[in-house]
Amino acid sequence: MDNTFSTPLLVQPLKLGADVVVHGAAKYLNGHGDVVAGFSAARKKIMDQIRMVRLKDITGAMVGPQEAFLILRGLKTLKVRLDAVCANTQKVVDFLAGSKYVQKVFYPSLENHPDHAVAVREMTRFGGVVSFEMGSFEEAKKVLNHVHLCALAVSLGD
């Protein structure tokens, strides 16, 4: 399971039965946009198999000391940052859900979300990813042309 956007603070997939979990550490875990790293965690049986085939020798499984330092720096503020992300995202969701211009909002805190019950059961909070539908393509273009916080970028979140 890719847990990049949830982090271990919002979801702990191994406790929920996942066999392998991956995290893009360059996003929430680092939090400053100045490192490229990731990691995986797995059940012992799977980790033993990975060690046996020496997968780390092929994939370069060691993070450098500078990257490790930068990730640890980010982890110190992860809870505070995620608290703010979750609270602010819920405000955006509430605004969008109340807008006459928005047809549908997709966010797990909403009871009409298809996976709402699963999210309530498995997540401590609902994270910072939300999507929504406008009434038409033209309306969507108008929003994208007038929202200054969103930009096309090579890296998600930076």
Predicted regions and their residues:
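Conserved PLP-enzyme active-site core in the AAT-like
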Residues: 1-101, 106, 117
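Conserved C-terminal alpha-helix-loop-beta "cap" of PLP-dependent enzymes
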Residues: 101-158
